[in-house]
Swiss-Prot record:
Recorded coiled-coil stretches: none
Species of origin: Helicobacter pylori (strain J99 / ATCC 700824) (Campylobacter pylori J99)
A GO cellular component annotation in the UniProt record: cytosolic large ribosomal subunit
Keyword rRNA-binding recorded: yes
Name of encoding gene: rplP
Protein task: Binds 23S rRNA and is also seen to make contacts with the A and possibly P site tRNAs.
Quaternary structure, from the entry: Part of the 50S ribosomal subunit.
Protein name per the record: Large ribosomal subunit protein uL16
Gene Ontology molecular-function annotations: rRNA binding; structural constituent of ribosome; tRNA binding
Length: 141
């Protein structure tokens, strides 16, 4: 499960997820990748389930990079609890995703097999994504 080792503060405010990704929006390590095309929030379990689906399909060949890390705590109060009495405890760790953000990258895998593996992992993600290559990366999302 991905989460920070330690943080300065235990809980954060919700914040707003607006605009396009200015960082992490280009392929840096691999030659084919998944790029987000809408706003969303991804938690550590979704990151891991998409990674497992991808690596099982490619049978451990090549290399996969996870370009996102959940560093924002999401709190929740227990069920059937009255309002008040402070903010709830940390339930899970998430990351806000903006359009244009690269989520996963692959290298050293035949393009057809890589596209199939990335398509499997796309279904595990809670926002719309598209598969991009180094050549098609500069297209408008």
């Amino acid at each position: 499960m991905l989460m920070p080792k330690r943080t300065k503060y235990r809980k954060q405010m919700k914040g707003r997820n607006r605009g396009k990704a200015h960082r992490g929006n280009s392929i840096a390590f691999g030659d084919i990748a998944i790029k987000a095309i809408e706003h969303g929030r991804i938690d550590s379990r979704q990151i891991e389930s998409a990674r497992v689906a991808m690596t099982r399909h490619i049978k451990r060949a090549g290399k996969v990079w996870i370009r996102v890390f959940p560093d924002k705590p999401l709190t929740a109060k227990p069920l059937e609890t009255r309002m008040g009495k402070g903010k709830g405890s940390v339930e899970k760790w998430v990351m806000n995703i903006k359009p244009g953000r690269i989520v996963y990258e692959m290298l050293g895998i035949e393009e057809g097999l890589a596209r199939e593996a990335l398509a499997l992992s796309q279904s595990k993600l809670p926002f719309k994504t598209k598969i991009v290559t180094c050549e098609s990366e500069n297209e408008i999302y």
